[in-house]
């Protein structure tokens, strides 16, 4: 059975969708006060949290992550709102085993504000992308994408909600395609 870990920095809504359908070995957050940790507790999922500032440098921070991943024999790391750029230490240890979800149709609107950037650009549609993580920012090879239209009477809140709904469908589809067993 493939073991997965989820990395998230904040709310953890994508983590919750994943954890309700798939066995998650653990969730990691780079913020000790992130709501994702409460979600994990409620779902009975093991959680870890530590912050970059607790380490001498990013290489040491990522070495601690690699140690966790190896200790739990993780096969696939699912980034779900993890707002740190994966650096060379983690990438070298887990290249080809880290995926990310991005709330835009890449290569359009990479970076931390995909939904807002798409909205402000006035595009007719944006979407959701799951891709392999590489050394760039949202530049890895696309695994799967889905388009989300911007409706005539949309507010940014409605548009964002539809993008999140698309995310909640796409991550399980990708995990199924990788042969991750469901609960």
Language-model-detected regions and their locations in the chain:
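N-terminal beta1-alpha1 ligand-phosphate binding loop
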Residues: 2-38
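N-terminal glycine-rich "phosphate-gripper" loop used for MgATP/nucleotide binding
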Residues: 29-30, 58, 72-88
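Donor/substrate-binding cores of folate-linked one-carbon enzymes
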Residues: 21, 83-182
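Short, well-structured alpha-helical segments in soluble
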Residues: 63-72
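Conserved acidic residues
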Residues: 25, 75, 96
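Hydrophobic beta-strand scaffold residues
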Residues: 47-48, 76, 98, 125
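Short, surface-exposed acidic-centric catalytic microdomains
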Residues: 23-64
């Amino acid at each position: 059975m493939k073991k997965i870990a989820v990395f998230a920095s904040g709310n953890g809504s994508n983590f919750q969708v994943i954890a309700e359908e798939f066995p998650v070995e653990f969730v990691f957050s780079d913020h000790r006060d992130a709501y994702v940790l409460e979600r994990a507790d409620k779902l009975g999922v093991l959680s870890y949290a530590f912050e970059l500032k607790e380490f001498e440098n990013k290489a040491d921070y990522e070495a601690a992550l690699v140690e966790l991943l190896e200790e739990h024999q993780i096969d696939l790391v699912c980034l779900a709102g993890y707002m740190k750029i994966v650096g060379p230490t983690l990438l070298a240890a887990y290249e080809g085993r880290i995926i990310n979800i991005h709330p835009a149709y890449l290569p359009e609107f990479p970076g931390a504000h995909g939904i807002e950037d798409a909205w402000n650009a006035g595009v007719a549609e944006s979407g959701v992308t799951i891709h392999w993580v590489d050394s760039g920012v949202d530049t890895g090879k696309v695994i799967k994408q889905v388009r989300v239209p911007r409706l005539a009477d949309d507010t940014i809140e409605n548009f964002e909600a539809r993008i999140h709904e698309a995310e909640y469908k796409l991550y399980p589809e990708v995990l199924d395609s990788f042969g991750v067993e469901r609960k």
